[in-house]
């Protein structure tokens, strides 16, 4: 069954998590957001009503599972179920920020692997494939039993630092897990710049203790590269040790600006000169906080999935 004559098969929907990004992606596609209502009953249950006919259509639903994570996750699952039951030809879950990605392994034998469970739930709800950006660990790609498009924001983040003198900067990974990301950023911004790494410990969740740093940042403008800013504790600790090691200044960039309560205030009082994040999660630029747009990367991924453009690579290999 095909859509009516003259009607594109593409439908782009948004939940409540980040309608601004969804609208930007739709505009990049020369499309309008399709009609859907996602509301909450008085008892807290979520209701989804799809107003556009999705039968035999190619549906893309854009919904980061950012805070409140559980609410936005349930919204996404219910939307996928609604599309599937209404006869959509294909349902692609576009999840710019994948909540639960930091629970990708067990630290004790009696913990769940929450990131894997969420991947399973997406498949059960009706997702045909998933598009996401900068998962915490590359190994998480194996959690999905569906086709996965894993995008990376580094080219857009690097563009925010295009004006720096490559001879005067140093790139810093705030922990061992961010080294590959920092090295990839270095190749985009300043291929000859030194790369440093901060060694940290977490005595308790959301607490950070820096133990050491490797790499020469003396007299240089340091740029810390990470995937997520949550409490700001990691960035603050890394910035402090970088300055103690003789850096002239320190800035930071990350894909996902989660910004837990109090994080903005922590970073506003920090020595960081610039903090650059993307709009995978809704956040308003203010002061030293800058927000760059990744809508074009998602739009290009959608075009590639639909076979409309195949010559441009949108997913890079960053662990």
Question: At which residue positions do the language-model features occur?
Answer:
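PRPP-associated nucleotide enzymes
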Residues: 1-319
């Amino acid at each position: 069954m095909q859509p009516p004559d003259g009607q594109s098969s593409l439908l782009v929907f948004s939940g409540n998590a980040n309608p601004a990004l969804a609208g930007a992606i739709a505009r990049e596609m020369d499309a309008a957001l399709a009609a859907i209502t996602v509301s909450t009953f008085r008892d807290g249950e979520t209701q989804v009503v799809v107003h556009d006919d999705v039968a035999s259509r190619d549906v893309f639903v854009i919904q980061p599972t950012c805070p409140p994570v559980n609410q936005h996750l349930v919204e996404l699952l219910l939307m996928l179920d609604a599309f599937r039951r209404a006869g959509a030809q294909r349902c692609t879950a576009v999840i710019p920020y994948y909540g639960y990605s930091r629970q990708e392994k067990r630290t004790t034998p009696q913990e769940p692997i929450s990131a894997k469970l969420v991947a399973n739930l997406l498949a059960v709800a009706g997702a045909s494939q998933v598009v996401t950006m900068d998962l915490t660990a590359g190994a998480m790609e194996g959690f999905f039993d569906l086709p996965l498009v894993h995008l990376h924001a580094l080219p857009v983040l690097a563009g925010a630092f295009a004006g720096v003198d490559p001879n005067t900067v140093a790139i810093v990974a705030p922990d061992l897990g961010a080294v590959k990301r920092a090295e990839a950023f270095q190749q985009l911004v300043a291929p000859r710049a030194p790369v440093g790494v901060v060694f940290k410990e977490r005595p308790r969740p959301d607490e950070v203790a820096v133990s050491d740093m490797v790499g020469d940042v003396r007299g240089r403008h340091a740029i810390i590269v990470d995937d997520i800013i949550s409490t700001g504790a990691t960035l603050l600790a890394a910035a402090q040790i970088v300055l103690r090691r003789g850096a002239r200044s320190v800035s930071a960039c990350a894909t996902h600006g989660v910004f837990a309560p109090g994080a903005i205030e922590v970073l506003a009082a920090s020595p960081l000169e610039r903090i650059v994040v993307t709009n995978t999660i809704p956040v308003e630029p203010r002061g030293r906080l800058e927000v760059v747009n990744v809508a074009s990367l998602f739009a290009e991924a959608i075009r590639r999935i639909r076979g409309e453009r195949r010559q441009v690579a949108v997913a890079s290999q960053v662990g």
